[in-house]
Amino acid sequence: MKKEGILNSELAKIADDLGHTDQVCIGDLGLPVPSGVKKIDLALTRGKPSFQEVLDIYLENILVEKVYLAEEIKENNPEQLAILLTKLSADVEIVFVSHETLKLMNHEVKAVVRTGENTPYSNIILQSGVAL
């Protein structure tokens, strides 16, 4: 049994299989998951686990080169955005797109990780970097 790192077997498998430029979405309770895209449902109850808790574990284990966020988070959830931005290293490219575009982009991700987060626009697509 693993004693550290990502313990959820589905999420660990996705993380282990990521290649350069592969993408994973971490989303809130309400984010729709397109048909055919793997859904890893971590939600236990409203707010648990939080978006930030899941993001922390992901960032500890995966090299990220680019993230996509909904433009709407700036106006509708600035607190979440401020916390999120402190966690990204300076070399991570941040791209803002419309929420509708973000949902369309989810058709191409390796998985959508559903959290218990119940605040608006708490969704991020993380693009894997390469450790060379």
From Swiss-Prot:
The active site is at residue 20. It catalyses: beta-D-ribopyranose = beta-D-ribofuranose. The keyword Magnesium does not apply. Substrate binds at residues 28, 99, 121-123. Coiled coil: none annotated. GO terms for molecular function: D-ribose pyranase activity; intramolecular lyase activity; monosaccharide binding. It is found in: Cytoplasm. Pathway: Carbohydrate metabolism; D-ribose degradation; D-ribose 5-phosphate from beta-D-ribopyranose: step 1/2. Its EC number is 5.4.99.62. GO terms for cellular component: cytosol. InterPro entries: D-ribose_pyranase (IPR023064), RbsD-like_sf (IPR023750), RbsD_FucU (IPR007721). Keywords: Carbohydrate metabolism, Cytoplasm, Isomerase. GO terms for biological process: D-ribose catabolic process. Catalyzes the interconversion of beta-pyran and beta-furan forms of D-ribose. Homodecamer. Belongs to the RbsD / FucU family. RbsD subfamily. This is D-ribose pyranase.
